[in-house]
Amino acid sequence: MTSQRSRTAGRPTLEQVAARAGVGRGTVSRVVNGSDQVSPHAREAVERAIAELGYVPNLAARALVTQRTDAVALVVSESEERVFGEPFFAGIVRGISSGLVNAQLQLWLAMAQSAAERERVEHHLTSQHVDGVMLLSLHDADPLPLLVEQRGLPLVLGGRPARLTRPGASAGWFVDVDNIGGAQRAVDHLHASGRRVVATIAGPQDMGAGLARLAGYREACRAHGLATDDGLVAYGDFSYEAGVAAMRQLLERRPDIDSVFVAADLMAAGALRTLREAGRRIPDDVAVVGFDDSGVARQTDPTLTTVRQPIEEMGREMARLLIARIAGEEPEESFTVLDTTVVVRESA
């Protein structure tokens, strides 16, 4: 037997769907574009005809009618190697994807670290291509937030920008974790276990997370009467290699350190390697606490005590806020800050 679909030449059209459903072309168009100005009976007939014919809407034509692309962008200001190699980014993408499922929005992912990548991204971030934008791993001098706002696109940031950590800065649309509180809890844990010379490997100081975690470390050290001099602070870019190098610096400057709070699990894994190479026992000689509670924390030797941030929940919240902005809604708060907790394992 030959099915109706196989007899239809080429791609099914709106008119063919209307004929099959026994309704007008306008009714089909309203169903396809999500209008509620259609009776339940007519909607059911149209949806049945669409399924039988295998009709796929012309997205370009639909966009002209709805002024929507049904796509959103996630732009990460990091290299492709880091985005696909580090657990944090994978968790964020999983969370965003799950948050967009019910909204039927397609996710467009791009990296924007090099000048060429940034130029391509800038050409794509228009209302003709996407309905909204999420930006992640922003550095202080990144021009993308201002560009997106100037183009009138709904925008949500992953992480509090560095400028918003300064006194008097106004809040924006963002999702973050309690970085200051998490760092304080890490130092509290080290102090409670008898550590008195607590060093830190801080993140980049042109990023909100890097600034906040260092501030939390310093506040907790002051509260416990611990030293926070420059010799106890080294810096890294959240990578494994940076953790290796920063731990070497700390051991050279202050061989008497008995603990270290590290602003990211990958850097903490690098620090553990350097400590082992230096003959330091962990945690007997030096205790180590990381930040993230990524899969890396369970794979290190010894396993890593760390501050847990709910990465996938952060991605889902980013998607929720962006959907609200696209719909023109005004939530009670334009930002979300998620709690952090210390997960105790062998390294501290």
What is each of the regions a protein language model found here?
Residues 7, 248, 252-348:
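Flexible loop/turn connectors
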Residues 27-29, 67-81, 189, 197-204:
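Short beta-strand segments enriched in small/hydrophobic residues
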Residues 1-9, 71-75, 79-188, 256:
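Alpha-helical recognition/docking segments in bacterial nutrient-uptake
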Residues 78-91, 109-117, 174-185, 201-248, ...:
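Hinge/beta->alpha junction and helix N-cap segments in small-molecule ligand-binding domains
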Residues 24, 70, 131, 195-197, ...:
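Short acidic/polar active-site loop segments enriched in Thr and Asp
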Residues 1-70, 348:
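N-terminal helix-turn-helix DNA-binding module of bacterial transcription factors
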Residues 130-136, 199-201, 233, 254-264, ...:
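Periplasmic-binding protein-like
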